[in-house]
Regions:
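Conserved phosphate-binding/catalytic region of the ribokinase-like
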Residues: 14, 40-132
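Conserved beta-alpha-beta core of the PfkB/ribokinase-like small-molecule kinase fold
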Residues: 1-47, 64-65
Length: 132
């Protein structure tokens, strides 16, 4: 499940937690959404609390890369350097598509994060959310 935006997280925090603990296997969100969900001021505090939940948590961090938490292990991935960002539309969606493509092909989490970062870097170099 994707957290969508911080306002949605704020309105439905209790429901998100119930889903996360009982029904979901995978949660994806950006740093702000995760901090809002966990009601923490910084990502490290949020991640430390999320490590105890036995789910795959994926956190995008814009130019600061991405993070995955699984089985009490935190995996970091640097972002792909983009000289000029043109439009952020579609960056999260392309990250997720790259991540899940590799995940479904049974690649390790680091490779999944890298592919997500590569695709999101491609889309932010142009206007719009289509690669072609």
């Amino acid at each position: 499940m994707s957290l969508s935006d911080i306002f949605c997280v704020n309105r439905h925090r209790e429901d998100f937690f119930k889903l996360l603990k009982n029904d979901l296997n995978i949660l994806i969100g950006n740093e702000n959404e995760i901090n809002e969900l966990m009601q923490k001021k910084n990502l490290l505090d949020s991640m430390n609390e999320l490590k105890s939940i036995d789910k795959l948590i994926i956190i995008t961090r814009s130019e600061n890369g991405s993070v995955a938490i699984l089985n009490n292990v935190i995996t970091y991935c640097e972002s792909v350097n983009v000289k000029k960002v043109v439009d952020l539309t579609g960056a999260g969606d392309l990250f997720a598509s790259g991540f899940f493509k590799e995940y479904l092909d049974n690649f390790d989490i680091k490779k999944c994060l890298q592919t997500g970062s590569e695709l999101s870097a491609k889309i932010i170099k142009k206007i719009g959310a289509r690669l072609n």
